[in-house]
C-alpha cells in the first residue's frame, strides 16, 4: 500500500516526464523543482543559481545527474520501475546522509520504508556502474597521454 502511494507521488512529481522518454536535464530539473516545492508557476531563477541550488541539494551538477540517469538506462542497471525522483532521492541521501525522517521530509514527505528502498536500490545501481565508468575514464586518459606524447 505504501509503495503505491509513493509511486503515485513520484508520478505526480514527474508529470511531464514519461518513464520511457530519455531523461534530459530539463526533465531532471523539473522533478527537482517539484521536490523543492517550486512548481511551474513559481519565479524562474537564473540557470547558474538553479545549478548551484541543485549541487547544494543533490551533491552534483544537473548535467551529471542527467548523465547518471542515461548511463543507468544504457547499461541496463536502472532498478525496475525506478523513476527520476528516486535517483534524486539517492543523490540526496549520498550528499546529506542524514536521519531518515529528515530525508523523507526533504523528499516531499514520503514514507521511510519507501525512501530507504528506492534510495538504496539506486545507490547500488550507481555503484555497479563503477567498472564501466572507471574503465572508460582510464581508457580515454590513456589515449590522451598517448597522443599528447606523440605530438
Regions picked out by a protein language model, each given a short descriptive name:
Residues 105-118:
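Short, basic interhelical loop/turn and adjoining N-cap
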Residues 81-82, 135:
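Short amphipathic alpha-helical segments embedded in low-complexity Lys/Glu-rich regions
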Residues 116-151:
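Active-site- or DNA-interface-adjacent structural scaffold in DNA-acting proteins
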Residues 83-96:
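Short, amphipathic alpha-helical "recognition" segments used to contact nucleic acids or chromatin
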Residues 95-107:
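Short, charged amphipathic recognition helices of the HTH superfamily
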Amino acid at each position: 500500500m505504501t509503495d503505491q502511494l509513493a509511486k503515485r507521488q513520484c508520478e505526480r512529481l514527474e508529470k511531464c516526464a514519461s518513464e520511457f522518454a530519455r531523461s534530459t536535464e530539463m526533465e531532471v530539473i523539473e522533478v527537482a523543482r517539484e521536490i523543492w516545492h517550486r512548481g511551474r508557476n513559481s519565479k524562474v531563477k537564473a540557470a547558474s543559481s538553479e545549478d548551484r541550488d541543485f549541487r547544494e541539494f543533490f551533491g552534483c551538477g544537473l548535467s551529471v545527474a542527467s548523465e547518471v540517469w542515461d548511463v543507468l538506462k544504457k547499461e541496463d542497471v536502472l532498478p525496475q520501475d525506478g523513476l527520476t525522483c528516486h535517483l534524486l532521492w539517492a543523490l540526496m541521501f549520498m550528499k546529506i546522509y542524514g536521519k531518515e525522517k529528515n530525508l523523507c521530509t526533504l523528499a516531499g514527505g514520503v514514507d521511510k520504508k519507501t525512501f530507504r528502498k528506492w534510495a538504496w536500490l539506486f545507490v547500488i545501481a550507481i555503484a555497479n556502474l563503477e567498472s564501466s565508468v572507471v574503465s572508460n575514464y582510464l581508457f580515454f586518459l590513456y589515449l590522451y597521454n598517448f597522443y599528447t606524447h606523440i605530438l
